[in-house]
From Swiss-Prot:
Annotated source species: Bos taurus (Bovine)
Keywords, in A-Z order: Cytoplasm, Transferase
Protein name, UniProt field: Glutathione S-transferase theta-1
SUPFAM superfamilies: GST C-terminal domain-like (SSF47616), Thioredoxin-like (SSF52833)
Coiled-coil boundaries: none
Length: 240
């Protein structure tokens, strides 16, 4: 059995892996896991990943979870162009620096924005107070300021003059609040221009394909009561 990727393009880390594999022509079998149907909560899925999360990479008997680990595995195994994850010590460290920061900063805030603005009230039928939503969006704004001020600055891409894994991970995170209707690029010309460069670098068709699901998140159908009961505690823990 060749390379298998268990993904749902509703998930921002899954989108990053999907784009990376497609852009670098890495052959893989897509195993779609529909999160909104609770497929990740099944006993069968738990046999693949006891954490019951996507993404998952399966390469023969080797199973790997966690999106950054998967991206690095693919970059190393398939000898992708150096700009994605450079050999140069300091250039590589810059990519690592961003990937270390984003987990608890940009990712958390983008995830909370999507769930507080759309997925909790629309998909799970759970109201979110205006105060909670305002706090969430203010924290997202602060993370965007750091993204622009510390990481992007006046460069073409987050870590230099070429696209890297840092840019790919960042843009897929930012499309979460975009999918919720947040104007994250409005009033931020540097970030808006960076987004255009990232889209051009990966290819606009591939970019749109990967983000079709998240851009329709507002149209999600309400979860059935049984699924809601199973999902709600996990969701609340995830977005704390």
């Amino acid at each position: 059995m060749g390379l298998e990727l268990y993904l749902d393009l509703l998930s921002q880390p899954c989108r990053a892996i999907y784009i990376f594999a497609k852009k670098n022509r890495i052959p893989f079998e897509l195993r779609t896991v529909d999160l909104r149907k609770g497929q990740h909560l099944s006993d069968a899925f738990a046999q693949v990943n006891p954490l019951q999360k996507v993404p998952i990479l399966k390469d023969g008997d080797f199973i790997l979870t966690e999106s950054v680990a998967i991206l690095l595995y693919l970059a190393r195994k398939y000898k992708v162009p150096d700009h994605w994850y450079p050999q140069d010590l300091q250039a590589c460290a810059r990519v690592d620096e961003y990937l270390a920061w984003q987990h608890t900063a940009l990712r958390r805030n983008c995830l909370r924005a999507l769930w507080h603005k759309v997925m909790l009230p629309v998909f799970l039928g759970e109201p979110v107070s205006p105060e909670m939503l305002a706090t969430t969006l203010a924290e997202l704004d602060m993370a965007l300021q750091v993204l622009e001020g510390k990481f992007l600055q006046d460069k073409a891409f987050l870590t230099g003059s070429h696209i890297s894994l840092a840019d790919l991970v960042a843009i897929t995170e930012l499309m979460h609040p975009v999918g919720a209707g947040c104007q994250v690029f409005k009033g931020r010309p540097k970030l808006a221009a960076w987004r255009q460069r990232v889209e051009a670098a990966v290819g606009e068709v591939l970019f749109q394909e990967a983000h079709e699901v998240i851009l329709k998140a507002k149209d999600s159908q309400p979860a059935d009561p049984t699924l809601k009961q199973k999902m709600l505690p996990k969701v609340l823990a995830m977005i704390q």
